[in-house]
Amino acid sequence: MSQSSSTTVGRLSTLDGAARAKLASACDYINAEVAKVRSRIFTVGAVCAALAAVVYAIMWANGVRDPRFPLFGAGIVVFLFATHQWRALNKTYKQIVVSRVVTALGHGMTYSPESSFTKEDFLRMDLFAQRTERWSAEDEVRGRKNAVTYSILEGKATRTEGSGKNRRTVVIFRGSIARLDFNKNFAGHTVVVPDGESKILGGLFGEASSRRQKDLCRLESVEFEAEYSVYSTDQQEARYILTPKMMELILGAAAAYPGVRMSFNDNSVFVTIPTSENRFEVGGLFGSRITPEIACGELAEVVHLAERLIDTLDLETRIWSRV
């Protein structure tokens, strides 16, 4: 990838003055809204605390000493109010800040708070051996690099275990998914997953049925195989895909985003990047002020990674010459 293209995405210094000004203005507006929401929550909390004290005084006068009822009631009201305010704030953040971030990043990218990425799409990647019961996706960014379209979205896959008091929700994946759509098909299906996990899951639960249809690939890079396991229905194509340059790129991505996985199937490349935070929401009511740098944040880095993958795969013409 040339130096000029590698610095196009995600560098605020490359934005023109108008784009920087619009982004800074949006951040200032959201910071003001955060302060207002914080003030409203404090006000409602104070009012609820005062009402709880009055109710408890009445209860005390009637011989009731247990304060849990007024405290619990006040807590529920404050929680519901704060949740409503938080959701409204995030909706505003997406409409004003995220849309301007996507526009500022360029390349004709577009943003939608919804995503068309389905549970079937998630399962078809074959990157997670655990059973998935529920899937949700949102915040989809679409762009184009050369002749390749790509999208980046936020997704969450979960399942429920146990029953009664032991019932709990297990998060299988939460984070970003980058999808690169080429106008050419892969002959097989190749997946790249963390090496340690594949050994643990394979030993405890056995491989998923879709994973059993793939063979473990042996590659020439000892460093790469120490970090990742590669399964494929087409051993030769897997080796064509995972060139030294591609393996170096994946290892670099893994250093920045531990747990990154990749799937090569049909005409698409999928990259999953786990995270505990939503990149398209306000970080918190009591955190640092939102700046253009924070707003662009990891989204710009993920876009940059997607475009580097596109460049690397586009150069490897032998991958496609067999189709």
Segments (PLM) and residue ranges:
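Cytosolic juxtamembrane N-terminal segments of multi-pass membrane proteins
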Residues: 2-39
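Charged, low-complexity intrinsically disordered regions
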Residues: 7-12, 39, 43, 99, ...
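Exposed alpha-helical structural elements
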Residues: 18, 22-25, 29, 88, ...
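Alpha-helical transmembrane segments
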Residues: 48-56, 76-83
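Hydrophobic alpha-helical transmembrane segments
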Residues: 57-76
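Transmembrane alpha-helices and immediately adjacent membrane-cytoplasm interface residues
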Residues: 71-95
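Membrane-interface amphipathic/juxtamembrane segments adjacent to transmembrane helices
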Residues: 86-114
